[in-house]
């Protein structure tokens, strides 16, 4: 009987030692490292399963080679590093420098920006611009449902593809998990290049359950772009039941579209392994646009070397003098963001947070 105990002990050590070494080498915050070690120590088998699905530090993964990422980011944006008559307000310069230095997110002047908070207005504008496309349409969305609205947008894309316009579509595999394959296959048969982002067979049991593409980007001919929180689904227009859907989306015309194009083409390389960097996708900006709206598009991802957007929030909160108003459908902040919010509030800055009701995460203390 004693031999069985020794066997169990050896098995436990054989599992625990590599598991703990893996956690220690994962280069995470000390508190998180200790928490995972305790979970593994007291629940070794269950703890390993939890760690595989939820604990791995994906920021260290290189899903795109450094050379390809360099060509898609730095080289595609290099000519925009120096822009004539670019005036950045002094109080915004530190923040914009932060994004430029760590994300190659260059600010662009003279943009026309329209804000949509109504789904009808957004879809009408999107369909209109799709109808005006002459060279290419690049659409990147988390949800593209096969409902009445989804078919309306799909038909518009198919019409343009049949006219010879290049149409590229990326949808998230988890976001569109319930959408029938025939919906996207119909678009492929019409000549649209369609790819799903990180396909998974069982979304609820994948280690990349939160490793999804939530971007909602559309770039048309490199001259007009859309970005925001609205997916392609009927509920974003008609709401759900008696409740109206409230979200925000932007239409950008001007140099800021170059940044949206870059974000899409990075995602496209990831799903298609095709390096699209031809300058025809970055056409000259219409000289008639003189709105004087400064645009800087910042992207972030689990594989980026820096948590760009999180650092931006911290910087915004700590440099604010009067107020910071935040609106989000999900509020699960990191400790640095919470610390910055508390610090700013204690310094007398008016911090306001707008979230939907009801919420399922009432454990946060601000």
Predicted regions and their residues:
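N-terminal localization/anchoring segments of enzymes in phospholipid and broader phosphate metabolism
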Residues: 1-311, 315, 319, 343, ...
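Thr-Gly-centered strand-to-loop micro-motif
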Residues: 300, 326-328
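Conserved small/polar residues in nucleotide/adenosyl-binding loops
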Residues: 362-366
